[in-house]
Swiss-Prot record:
This is Uncharacterized protein MJ0585. Its main location: membrane. It is a multi-pass membrane protein. It is found in: Cell membrane. One of its GO terms (cellular component) is plasma membrane. The chain crosses the membrane at residues 4-24, 105-125, 130-150, 151-171, 182-202. Keywords: Cell membrane, Membrane, Transmembrane, Transmembrane helix.
């Protein structure tokens, strides 16, 4: 039993050593191919009629063939190649393409809808210069984030600051919460609400 276990371990380690040796050789061939390709391009640019060009091309061809032969001995490479050539892989690629296409259509539709709402709001506010100014200001502010100091941006982008501080979850970095489709309308309508609050206070007192 011990001998059998030892034999199995020996076979496993032998296979691992063989795979590592193949990977090292593939890496060496890749390095040689890259170096030879650079030399060939330099030679072709300097002297297209140089006799060494054909010699380099032949050597490059041989190196690529040897590299491919080694790759075919690598089980991982064969498995990957078989998977890429399988119907399952191409079906998955088709599903990914369809999903991306659907997402893009929804993104365009929502973008047009939000743009329409923003333009309609600006049209409604056209007679109230104060609110119109705040609305346009709210539209511009998000684009100033990396052009002004952070403390100043937090003041100018007060609605966004409140939104990020109290609404956006702490673990939402890089998520749709920070999408311009959300932050720009929040900034604009936030400043409109601030303007309405100011007008209400002035009117009341």
């Amino acid at each position: 039993m011990k001998k059998l276990a030892f034999l199995i371990l020996l076979i496993v380690f032998s296979n691992l050593s063989l795979v590592n040796a193949i990977d090292d050789n593939i890496s060496n061939y890749s390095k040689e191919i890259n170096e030879l390709t650079v030399k060939l391009k330099e030679l072709e640019s300097k002297n297209p009629n140089d006799e060494r060009i054909e010699e380099y091309k032949e050597k490059l061809k041989q190196l690529i063939e040897k590299q491919h032969e080694l790759k075919s001995q690598n089980l991982k490479y064969n498995e990957t190649l078989a998977y890429i050539q399988s119907e399952e892989y191409w079906k998955m690629q088709e599903e990914i393409w369809e999903y991306n296409n659907k997402v893009m259509k929804w993104f365009i539709a929502i973008s047009i809808l939000i743009l329409g709402i923003i333009l309609a709001t600006l049209w409604i506010l056209r007679k109230d210069k104060f609110l119109l100014f705040l609305a346009i200001f709210g539209l511009i502010v998000p684009f100033l984030q990396f052009k002004i100091p952070n403390w100043l941006f937090n003041i100018l982008a007060l609605p966004l600051f409140v939104y990020i501080k109290f609404i956006v979850p702490e673990c939402a970095e890089g998520s749709f919460y920070y999408s311009p489709l959300i932050t720009i309308p929040i900034s604009m309508y936030g400043w409109i609400l601030i303007g309405l609050a100011v007008k209400f206070i002035i009117k009341k007192y």
